[in-house]
A protein has these predicted regions:
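Immediate flanking context of iron-sulfur cluster ligation sites
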Residues: 14-32, 66-101, 118
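Short, charged/polar micro-motifs that form catalytic or ligand-binding hotspots
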Residues: 27, 94, 154, 158, ...
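Membrane helical hairpin/interfacial module
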Residues: 40, 44-78, 83-86
Length: 368
């Protein structure tokens, strides 16, 4: 469905939107190969904290013993202390699902609220959720329902941003263009949109996207390599990250041949990159209602695409030039855990977009 806000209607009636696959997701619990109760800090929200403080008996004692001063559970051998030997949750078993803290109940679901609009989605860092994001070759769709809302934001600007996002979705889902040209087109469009916002001409934000001819542009391989190298400067969240990036840098010894061969190999599955880009635009673009920075959100989607594509080439090469849906999910989960789950790492890219010459607008187009 169209993701623009409808005008009119009842006072304080808002829209709640989710991707069509959202309600199909269910946690697979102990069967999960990449358990989110292992290696992750579990933050306890205030409401759950009060509940845990009041639980009686032996289990209540254990709850309080395992909490630290930062209101999170202290991991034991890198595992949540309530993850049992069957990889199931003892809090769930002992005091019920409704007593799980918010992060455990919600993850991998995320919720963003923009005044009259609430949007939910599935985060890409969970393997089961990522499978829903990537497995369908049909364009990502969205469902909406009405709800009462209280929070306020600049509704007029939100409407403009929703229109901008819908235009970007239209480009990303236009399968007559190759994926690289789609990314360049949305970067050009976001650049024009940002120019109008910066000059206080929000009412002149372009209502449609200009198509450009990118046939003469040549990829700058050195800049692609520099882009991957930046990943070594991130705060390390995942132990395997550095090794994966160093391995990926090896593809640049024979990049022209390898990337050309991979492009042919993956050409029937470009929809996976389309779904990836729609995910990033859906999750992040409307945050511009708070900071007026559309271009950075689109650049973040674009740089994520560039980096993940290089990770894909490297994994394909390691696998004897095979690359399955499971490989796609592993790369995207790793990237998401490393980048999306660390605000410092998102901020790092935001800074690079401002100051690193490889992200100067026209130069950036040539690394896509």
């Amino acid at each position: 469905g169209d993701c623009r806000l409808q005008t009119g209607g009842m006072e304080n009636m808002g829209i709640k939107r989710v991707p069509t696959y959202f309600n199909e997701f269910a946690c697979i619990g102990g069967a999960c190969e990449d358990n989110c109760c292992i290696g992750w800090e579990v933050d306890i929200d205030d409401e759950s904290l009060e509940v845990y403080k009041s639980v009686g008996g032996e289990f209540g004692d254990k709850l309080r013993r395992c909490m630290n001063d930062e209101n999170s559970f202290t991991l034991k051998n890198n595992r949540c202390p309530f993850l049992n030997d069957k990889n199931l949750c003892d809090i769930f078993i002992n005091i019920g699902e409704d007593k799980l803290c918010t992060v455990c109940t919600e993850y991998p679901r995320f919720t963003e609220t923009y005044g009259s609009l609430t949007e939910k989605g599935l985060g890409m860092s969970c393997e089961s959720a990522a499978e829903f994001i990537f497995k369908s070759d049909k364009p990502t769709g969205f469902e909406t329902e009405k709800f009462d809302y209280e929070e306020e934001c600049d509704e007029d600007f939100l409407r403009i941003l929703l229109n901008v996002r819908e235009n970007i979705f239209d480009v990303l889902k236009n399968r007559k263009m190759n994926i690289s040209d789609r990314v360049k087109t949305i970067l050009n469009y976001a650049y024009d949109v940002q120019d109008k916002i910066n000059n206080n001409n929000v009412d002149k934000v372009p209502q449609s996207v200009d198509n450009c001819d990118f046939s003469q542009s040549e990829k700058c391989i050195n800049d692609i390599k520099e882009c991957v190298k930046l990943c070594l400067s991130l705060e390390i969240m995942e132990d395997s990250w550095t090794g994966v990036i160093e391995n990926t840098l090896g593809i640049f010894d024979n990049y022209d041949n390898l990337s050309g061969e991979f492009d042919l190999y993956i050409s029937g599955r470009e929809y996976e990159y389309e779904n990836l880009l729609v995910y990033f635009i859906y999750r992040y673009l409307l945050k511009a209602v708070f900071d007026c920075d559309v271009l950075t959100k689109v650049r973040f989607a674009a740089v994520s695409y560039v980096i993940i594509r290089q990770l894909d080439i490297a994994r394909w090469l390691r696998n004897g030039k095979e690359f399955s849906l499971k490989d796609r999910i592993k790369n995207c989960v790793l990237y998401s855990k490393e980048v999306e789950h660390c605000q410092d790492n998102i901020d790092f890219f935001d800074e690079e977009f401002l100051f690193n010459p490889i992200f100067e607008h026209n130069r950036f187009l040539n690394l896509i």
